[in-house]
Amino acid sequence: MATKSCELVLCFFVFFVISFSAISVSAQTCDNTTGTFIPNSPYDKNRRLILSTLASNVTAQEGYFIGSIGIAPDQVFATGMCAPGSERDVCSLCIRSTSESLLQSCLDQADAFFWSGEETLCLVRYANRPFSGLLVMDPLGAIFNTGELNTNQTVFDIEWNNLTSSMIAGITSSSSGGNNSSKYYSDDIALVPDFKNISALMQCTPDVSSEDCNTCLRQNVVDYDNCCRGHQGGVMSRPNCFFRWEVYPFSGAIDQINLPKSPPPSVTSPSPIANITKNDSRISGGKIAAIVVVTVVTIILVVLGFVISNRRKQKQEMDLPTESVQFDLKTIESATSNFSERNKLGKGGFGEVYKGMLMNGTEIAVKRLSKTSGQGEVEFKNEVVVVAKLQHINLVRLLGFSLQGEEKLLVYEFVSNKSLDYFLFDPTKRNQLDWTMRRNIIGGITRGILYLHQDSRLKIIHRDLKASNILLDADMNPKIADFGMARIFGVDQTVANTGRVVGTFGYMSPEYVTHGQFSMKSDVYSFGVLILEIISGKKNSSFYQMDGLVNNLVTYVWKLWENKSLHELLDPFINQDFTSEEVIRYIHIGLLCVQENPADRPTMSTIHQMLTNSSITLPVPLPPGFFFRNGPGSNPGQSNSKSFACSVDEATITDVNPR
């Protein structure tokens, strides 16, 4: 009985060691040769920020993204990539888990990469210098399968060499087709007589040339042949290329590998990696018990330390991130020529916006809050905390802030084409927005809100979505701006209430105005209004005549729907580059967004699917909120369920008491 107990304990211990090794050993490399950083320094905070948003950016860019955040010397460059054909959810999960693994493993290295995955292959890399287009051969990550080949090595080598050579040739000769994520990718199988199939996968990053890809993959093959020949598979990975083969089918980067109990040393030259030797010495029951006790206690201490550290991290993240993004007031004054009038870009509800240029040549937009503005220090800090945690191609990027004396300044990336309303509601500029451009703007706004609601590590409710808060870059790509009113939701939180309603009339949902209740569906309502404005070129806050009655835009569109004349909504300035079916579908989606009951409105993920997949059947919309039922004795400012006086003012409302 004692022997059986010892055997059970031994089995548990061996299982634990193998399981623990499988988790900790991976094809990741923290590079010590390019410098280190101090934990919680500006560089570290920028690193955490860009990695936290990498998954959403990768999925938004069809499987491949490269970008940077911050200002030198704290600027962090990062890239993320998934294997072609990866499902969005699978890709997003792979990027998120891989990013988190890098943060936990590379504690102070300024350069690191990790090829990872179970259901799909993905890459995450960050560095303190630009690397796009540059072939980097060091360091090398190496893992080999501990199982040994049991076949004729000569015959096996011939098939193995033929397979790897043909794959490399195929990858580098057909690199021009497909999108970035499908460039330089191949998986293949070869049959070894009287043995098993060889499954192999290769991929390069799409930013390098085909010649560099060829060089990188060939060196991976050579390194494996020199270090690990005779084993049943393994992984060789570099920052720009990945190679894996096994004697069984696989999909991800490290799943199902029978990993050694400790990782082999990295290969920097074609020298063999030391094999893991097995010891057959007997271990006494007392020693086994002692080992198990020590192991369990160690695990408990590690978990406890992780929980405490995570709680401290969460508390720190809610504080103002002063170290990473704070600018000296004199720096901002110098960049804007002391807030010169000629540098003024415009004036918003909370102050003025100025163009500036930092000493390193970076163009910036400085939001200078007026001393009498409704946005106080609480809202100011809220905008800094919220935006500093976000990174997406369709969100304006916060570079920093300054809070000195009475001056409250927010420093954003400069977006050259001003805001959407500057074009949309101008009688001469709106003709620059053809249907293709308006459709792309709607799609970009959709992805930005979807990121806020679902894909970022925070759940953000914007609460002030409107045309003037959508900025347009040089390529007319939309960027959501102005997060002063935004609220962070908990993971499981869906609805919140407030006694202080903020936002802009015409864009605010009925339940928010009348009851102070807001949720993701409040943003959906605002987005629906935006869709209708973008298609019509009309402001929701304006009033229109139809059948001799006064209407707001939402009511006007609803009556067009009832009359089956939605085509009348289309802005006459839109060029003839559209189909009426597509335009009507977009109007239909807009009406679904502005339905009175929040439960009837679709989520942003459903909206994205509706916009991108025309085969999805749209439900019939119900009457919208603030639908004016005009008639004898009726008040034109009355909705179908609540009496409410609408304002046509475009300024953001900061203090309204809900009923």
Swiss-Prot record:
Extracellular-facing ranges: 28-287
Span of domain Gnk2-homologous: 28-131, 137-250
Pfam families: PK_Tyr_Ser-Thr, Stress-antifung
Record InterPro entries: GNK2, GNK2_sf, Kinase-like_dom_sf, Prot_kinase_dom, Protein_kinase_ATP_BS, Ser-Thr/Tyr_kinase_cat_dom, Ser/Thr_kinase_AS
Glycan-bearing residues: 32, 57, 152, 162, 179-180, 197, 275, 279
Catalytic residues in the record: 464 (proton acceptor)
Annotated protein name in UniProt: Cysteine-rich receptor-like protein kinase 18
Residues with Phosphothreonine modification: 504
Gene3D superfamilies: Gnk2 domain, C-X8-C-X2-C motif, Phosphorylase Kinase, domain 1, Transferase(Phosphotransferase) domain 1
Signal sequence residues: 1-27
GO cellular component, one term: membrane
Residue intervals on the Cytoplasmic side: 309-659
Organism: Arabidopsis thaliana (Mouse-ear cress)
Predominant localisation class: membrane
Domain Protein kinase: 339-611
EC number annotated for this UniProt entry: 2.7.11.-
Segments passing through the bilayer: 288-308
SUPFAM superfamilies the UniProt entry points to: Protein kinase-like (PK-like) (SSF56112)
Subcellular location: Membrane
Enzyme class: transferase
Listed SMART domains: S_TKc (SM00220)
Example of a GO MF term: protein serine/threonine kinase activity
CDD domains: Gnk2-like (cd23509), STKc_IRAK (cd14066)
Catalytic activity: L-seryl-[protein] + ATP = O-phospho-L-seryl-[protein] + ADP + H(+); L-threonyl-[protein] + ATP = O-phospho-L-threonyl-[protein] + ADP + H(+)
Residues where Phosphoserine is found: 468
